[in-house]
Amino acid sequence: MQEQYNPQDIEHKVQQHWDNNKTFVVSEDPNKEKFYCLSMFPYPSGRLHMGHVRNYTIGDVVSRFQRLQGKNVLQPIGWDAFGLPAENAAVKNNTAPAPWTYENIEYMKNQLKLLGFGYDWNREFATCRPEYYRWEQEFFTKLFAKGLVYKKTSSVNWCPNDQTVLANEQVEDGCCWRCDTPVEQKEIPQWFIKITAYAQELLDDLDNLDGWPEMVKTMQRNWIGRSEGVELKFAVKGENTDLEVYTTRPDTLMGVTYVGIAAGHPLATKAAANNPALAAFIDECKNTKVAEAEIATMEKKGMATGLTAIHPLNGREVPIYIANFVLMDYGTGAVMAVPAHDQRDFEFATKYGLDIIPVIKPADGSELDVSEAAYTEKGVLFASGEFDGLDFQAAFNAIAAKLEAEGKGKKTVNFRLRDWGVSRQRYWGAPIPMVTTEDGQVHPVPADQLPVILPEDVVMDGVTSPIKADKEWAKTTFNGEPALRETDTFDTFMESSWYYARYCSPQADDILDPEKANYWLPVDQYIGGIEHACMHLLYSRFFYKLLRDAGYVKSDEPFKKLLCQGMVLADAFYYTNDKGGKEWVSPTEVKVERDGKGRIVSAVDATGRQVEHSGMIKMSKSKNNGIDPQEMVDKYGADTVRLFMMFASPADMTLEWQESGVEGANRFLRRVWKLVREHTELGQAPALDASALNADQKALRRDVHKTIAKVTDDVARRQTFNTAIAAIMELMNKLTKAPMTEAQDRAILDEALKAITLMLYPITPHICFEMWVALGQSNIDTASWPTYDEAALVEDEKLIVLQVNGKLRGKLTVAADATQQQVEALGMQDENVQKFIDGLTVRKVIYVPGKLLNIVAN
């Protein structure tokens, strides 16, 4: 062993060894238990950031731990390579998205290797390659054949100046990010996959995901949004048509005072035909893109259509309003409004002077007051004719039954979940494999003509997709007839919805090789950010069920266990520029002064300018507070960076980046290195003889085995890696202080250092690889996780606390198997105890076995 720990030398050498020996390349082995560990694959943005490093370090720790458990471990990596940032970067750098993407992949691949992650690089792929997306295209055509894919018009953000569609993130304050033109909503035909056909199963199967955080499951339940309600019809006076509405509160039906319809509703269009004011209001509504989450807080606006609806049960006539809070995409695009019992309806009715008729009162008999706000609780019906006195459930059933009997409604289950719109009017994505013939018929591209290849040698003008601009690209034939290709590309969530399955057989001449897929799948441990809870994780679950129903996989769910790592935070600093804006300064260029409690009291940048401390916030480009992992690896070594990442906070909590903590992690590794070197320089350690140990030696060995037991549980079951590391550090402190004079002292240290090296290996593999060899062992990559010796955990002696009248008066060491009588006798003989009971009568003795003896005397 070198005298000084030199991470750069060691890490380069060990990484070469892994590469040359293909250490992490695996194949199916039916005789071995498999473990599939996966971190969400990266978007090749150019450089790794600390969030990546945290995610991939956790994955590598789990993978290496499972390898030491003797399992056949698959840990693959690839690139989520399509997407908008590549288009933006290409325009900015005057290149095309493809070369920019491939360059980034090469650079980031090298960064991942320098961090020592144990990936099976043979399985690597980039989703922008035709050999990947070809299978996605073919699977889409199969879904089309099954009736699970359809086309319908749907609204998009449209820039009238650039004549192009904008992604939501390209709309800034309602205007185009490029030319500042106000953005309009435009209806265009788009492709959808029927995720709603699987809504109930996606909801039910969440109950089987015991290894998922409760929070993620709750988010998905809310996103799917199952509700039970009644679908009912209001006739429209003087029109030969009905308005369909869905309600979860049919008990409030007798309190309806108006009906609200969406601006995009056919009835709204009809009413606006001869009404310019109404037509203008509809345009205003249509061009305000409203996310469902914003409805509660936005200003409620409406306009009367002049049409009247007829109440289905009591025949009362109520006005029909166009309301900006009714969305065409949700339900039927029409709602029955009960201002007395719905706050949104209440605000609208108050604003437009509409009736507010209460029909529900509190069940406890307290007074009902709807003068200031709606009463939204469930209660008892009144002013509802034959339904008076019924509670919510009874009224729900009775009103639903009456509507059904009269052919005006029925009980129904509704989902908030909408079908998955997969069309994107962008260039850098997989082409959608559909063509339209001259007769207007749409056809899937036949399998033998796939893939539909995205041309990579293109010129980006920053406005129109090159495959839309090039009219020749779309020209093709179908069965000998002229046809036009679809020029939209797939939503990039398509690629990430099945990539985990492709890793099982990346060379397969089909979307999957079922035999290989069923050996590896489902993924045993998935690791990624909680921001993907509702989109990526839901789409992946859906796609997996599609693969199952197509006969490719046998299980129902793709990910058994899910760990959502916390964000990485860092100090952020800024100064105010001449225009009053904030200029963010990198923390690496700031010198700070701290008070006694470690709080920053002053900060100065490299030019000597005073800067403001904005706090510890998420590392991001916009706040210029990212720390480049590369610099940290160059300075301290990959093992130190990995150790800090795992130790600084629990894996699922935010992590505060502190370079002082990184230095601390580095010091700890140097201490371990030093102890191993000093130990091995003395030559081979004598054999351990457990029967020959004295009390101190037994106690130290007990600490070693207690640590093994704790670390095993922390890593395998609790996934609290930080407490596992803390336990190893505590053991190290004891070992450095322990005497090393006798043969058995060295034997215990030898056992302890081997255990520590194995336990640290998943976290800091390079240094442990070297120390393992120094400790006289062969290859740590194929070693086994240490097991604790039950016998070593058994204590020969117990420390008993002695109390008189509940106050501490002494301590007593007794044999572990001492009886209560023996402990009482020894306790009574204690000098200090005798002093405090002298002249008193002992009333009773309380004994807590193995812990405490309390003598009550007066």
From Swiss-Prot:
Q: Indicate where this protein resides in the cell.
A: Cytoplasm
Tell me what reaction this enzyme catalyses: tRNA(Leu) + L-leucine + ATP = L-leucyl-tRNA(Leu) + AMP + diphosphate
**UniProt keyword annotations, A-Z:** Aminoacyl-tRNA synthetase, ATP-binding, Cytoplasm, Ligase, Nucleotide-binding, Protein biosynthesis
Primary localization: cytoplasm
Chain sites annotated for binding ATP:
621
Sorted alphabetically, which InterPro entries does this protein's record hold?
aa-tRNA-synth_I_CS (IPR001412), aa-tRNA-synth_Ia (IPR002300), Leu-tRNA-ligase (IPR002302), Leu_tRNA-synth_edit (IPR025709), M/V/L/I-tRNA-synth_anticd-bd (IPR013155), Methionyl/Leucyl_tRNA_Synth (IPR015413), Rossmann-like_a/b/a_fold (IPR014729), tRNAsynth_Ia_anticodon-bd (IPR009080)
Sequence motif 'HIGH' region, location on chain: 42-52
EC number, as in UniProt: 6.1.1.4
Q: Name one GO cellular component term.
A: cytosol
Which biological processes are named by the entry's GO terms? leucyl-tRNA aminoacylation
Key word Aminoacyl-tRNA synthetase present: yes
Keyword Nucleotide-binding listed? The answer is: yes
Quote one Gene Ontology molecular function term: aminoacyl-tRNA deacylase activity
Q: Where is this motif: 'KMSKS' region?
A: 618-622
- Could you say which protein family the record assigns here? Belongs to the class-I aminoacyl-tRNA synthetase family.
Can you say what this protein is called?
Answer: Leucine--tRNA ligase
What is the organism field in this record?
Vibrio cholerae serotype O1 (strain ATCC 39541 / Classical Ogawa 395 / O395)
Upper lineage: Bacteria, Pseudomonadati, Pseudomonadota, Gammaproteobacteria, Vibrionales
